[in-house]
Amino acid sequence: LEAIGRVCKKHHLLFVVDASQTAGVFPIQMDSMNIDVLCFTGHKSLMGPQGTGGMCVRKGVRIRPLLVGGSGIDSYSKIHPQVMPTALEAGTLNAHGIAGLSAALDFIKKVTPAVIRQREEELTRRFVSQIKSIPGVKLYGNYEQFPRAPILSLNILDYDSGEIADVLAQDYGIMTRAG
């Protein structure tokens, strides 16, 4: 990220990073990496509820809201608030989701990102070593290189990915996304 950030800064390009798989487990330094906007979802590596996420925006970067209205801050105004972050928060905030995300962040701080990353690496190595022994399994990518996010891409010959995802979830408690 640092190398890409340097190139973006040199050429005055906006550097937007999707940290959905890594936020909370891998260190991300917006300043030293020259990241202008850091986006993340709460339900993946941050272990929060679905429907949560966020965006860290470097001071001076202007973003237009996708939706406006119903801010709840100034309900009688006919103009949507212009002050950040309220300018990007149309509608009622997901207070329950935000509370759940806060609890997840407390858990990550308590356990530490390094311990979580180590456990994810152990599970990834174990899964890869076992899945390789199944005939017809095709793994995509280098699974010997760590640190890495615990994301795997694979196909199983003659099987629909949706069926495989269902079996892994129901029979083994392994969460996947088919497709």
Locate predicted features.
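Pyridoxal 5′-phosphate
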Residues: 1-179
